[in-house]
C-alpha cells in the first residue's frame, strides 16, 4: 500500500533494535534483516554467540551497522563499563534470530553464560525469539516446553 513503507520508517526511526545471532546455519540470513532495519532508520546493535562466528563474521555486521558487533563478554574494549547492562537499557526491542534450541533453552531457564544471554536476560523491553532449527529438534517436547 502507498505510504506503508513511510509508516514503518517513522515507527523504527530512532529505535534501537538489538539482534542476537546464534550458531545456526540461518545466521548468514540475518545480514539481510540488519540491512532492512537500517534502511528503515533503526539503530541496530548485534550480539553474536561464539558459535555464530563460524557461520558469519562480526565484521559483516559491523559494516552494516557502523557499530561494534559484540561477541565476548570479557572484551576490554567496550564503550561502557558494564556493556551488557548498558546495551539492555538502550534496546527498544531485543530479537534473537536465528535462535538455536541451545540458546532458547538457556534463556528459558535463566542461564546467562555469554554476552547474548546476559544482555537478553537484563533487557526489560519487548523480546522476540525466532527459532531456526531442524524440524525434529523444533518439535521435540523439550524444545516446545522451552
Task: Enumerate the language-model features and the residues they cover.
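A cross-family phosphate/adenosyl-ligand binding-site feature
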Residues: 2-146
